[in-house]
């Protein structure tokens, strides 16, 4: 036999025949299987005296592993085998490909509609603040009874899922708590209903994107709240422990470099910590990454650029509520202010069942894990509570009002900006184009009268007088 044939035979007889080698297509790396305990391993009919079970772990293959194969193969066949022959065999189709995330989802138990709603059970571990009460009082939602650890013997009751209750946010918000299929220890707030539906859609979309290269999860789940309430930890614990190598954190930076862009093809879940510290430029860059369907970059040590399919879903956490900056809309974000979260270190999530349910719903034609136009409208209204208003936006309703039909004073965007800046002593005024978006969103009518023989673009406004402004300021102080 040639040296190459010896290397192939050794790898086949000692590794491939016992499912000890595989190629991870997500990380594009070779993995080797090791026994959890060498002391307790059986010595019968297995290479190197090891017997493998489902609990045995896979790890990335190292240079030490390759050198060991070279030495053992050379010793067994008394041939001058080098690492070149071994690496050639390892980097071929002899090594089976595996997609660990898909492999796990397909290994989960089958879920049917008459079974408990495990995803909702997990969502109820997070208690959110009603967005309509955010500005008036904190902690407006009463705490729910603590959820118990989920196990086969400890199933949530009265928690079966129906397509009606999961397919649409708008229909769900119109239902009272007594009309739902959920058995709860507290009355559902609108924020709670919205949270549970959004979480389910986001989670199902995440699993669907793992299983189908054509699916991209365009939404970002965001938990906002004080420090130390397990926001980031809870999000990280949504991934089963043995798959957490396929989750990562993305650091805030002024520029998303090549390595950070490649992560959307290398990880199943990317967590954005301290999302509230990102500036407008960073958020805009992030939005382009969130909506990307693939990435075309040259990985480290690769010879050429390679198109890789987007895999990752995004989640985020932060402390400051007003982090959204886009005036035109923020439908990609699913932000919720958190009052409390059940300690994830003392809670066992029903991973097998929640992932089985997510995959079943992803394949159900009557369940939509995306958001339709009516649902997006609900989200936009909800997200207004998380938007960072500029100085101009805050001063606009104090100094101006939308005039009655057929009335109003004509002012250009520059004139309106000048008054806002002068009154508020604003050091860095917003761009006139952005102010125009603000005026349009606030309901002001755009018009183009002919002045001095030229068409001038502007707005019909009502300017408040000094007494009105003083009265409004007194009301705001109260």
Predicted region positions:
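AAA+/SF3 P-loop NTPase mechanochemical coupling elements
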Residues: 260-265, 299-317
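N-terminal nucleic-acid engagement/recognition segments and initiation subdomains in replication
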Residues: 1-133, 176, 193, 197, ...
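Conserved catalytic/switch belt of AAA+ P-loop NTPases
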Residues: 283-306
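A short helix-turn-beta junction within AAA+ P-loop NTPase domains corresponding to the substrate/partner-engaging
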Residues: 324-343
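Conserved AAA+/SF3 P-loop NTPase catalytic/coupling segment centered on the Walker-B
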Residues: 267-291, 324-329
């Amino acid at each position: 036999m040639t040296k190459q044939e010896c290397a192939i035979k050794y790898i086949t007889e000692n590794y491939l025949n016992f499912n000890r080698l595989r190629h991870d297509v997500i990380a594009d790396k070779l993995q080797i299987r090791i026994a959890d305990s060498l002391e307790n391993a059986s010595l019968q009919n297995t290479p190197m005296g090891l017997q493998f079970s489902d609990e045995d772990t896979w790890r990335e293959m190292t240079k030490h592993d390759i050198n060991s194969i070279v030495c053992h193969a050379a010793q067994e066949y008394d041939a001058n085998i080098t690492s070149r022959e071994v690496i050639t065999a390892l980097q071929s189709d002899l090594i089976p490909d595996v997609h660990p995330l898909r492999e796990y989802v397909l290994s989960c138990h089958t879920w049917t509609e008459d079974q408990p709603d495990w995803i909702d059970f997990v969502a109820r571990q997070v208690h959110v603040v009603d967005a309509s009460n955010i500005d008036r009082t904190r902690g407006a939602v009463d705490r729910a009874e603590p959820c118990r650890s989920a196990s086969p013997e400890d199933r949530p009751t009265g928690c079966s899922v129906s397509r009606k209750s999961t397919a649409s946010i708008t229909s769900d918000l119109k239902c009272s708590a007594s009309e739902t299929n959920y058995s709860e220890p507290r009355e559902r707030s609108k924020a709670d209903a919205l949270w549970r539906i959004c979480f389910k859609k986001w989670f199902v979309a995440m699993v669907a994107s793992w299983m189908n290269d054509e699916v991209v999860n365009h939404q970002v789940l965001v938990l906002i709240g004080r420090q130390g309430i397990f926001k980031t930890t809870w999000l990280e614990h949504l991934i089963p422990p043995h798959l957490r190598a396929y989750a990562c954190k993305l650091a805030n930076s002024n520029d998303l470099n090549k390595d950070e862009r490649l992560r959307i093809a290398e990880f199943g879940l990317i967590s954005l910590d301290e999302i509230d510290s990102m500036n407008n430029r960073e958020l805009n860059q992030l939005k382009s990454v969130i909506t990307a369907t693939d990435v075309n970059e040259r990985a480290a040590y690769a010879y050429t650029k390679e198109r890789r399919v987007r895999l990752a879903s995004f989640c985020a956490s932060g402390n400051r509520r007003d982090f959204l900056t886009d005036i035109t809309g923020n439908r990609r974000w699913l932000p919720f202010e958190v009052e409390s979260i059940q300690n994830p270190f003392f809670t066992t999530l029903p991973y097998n069942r929640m992932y089985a349910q997510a995959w079943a719903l992803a394949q159900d034609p009557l369940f939509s894990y995306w958001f339709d136009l009516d649902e997006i409208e609900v989200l936009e209204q909800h997200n207004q509570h998380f938007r960072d208003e500029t100085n101009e936006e805050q001063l606009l309703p104090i100094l101006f009002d939308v005039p009655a039909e057929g009335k109003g004073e004509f002012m250009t965007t520059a004139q309106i900006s000048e008054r806002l800046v002068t009154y508020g002593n604003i050091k860095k005024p917003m761009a006139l184009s952005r102010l125009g978006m603000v005026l349009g969103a606030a309901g002001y009518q755009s018009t183009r009268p002919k002045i001095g023989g030229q068409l001038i673009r502007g707005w019909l406004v009502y300017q408040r007088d000094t007494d009105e402004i003083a009265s409004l300021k007194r009301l705001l102080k109260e």
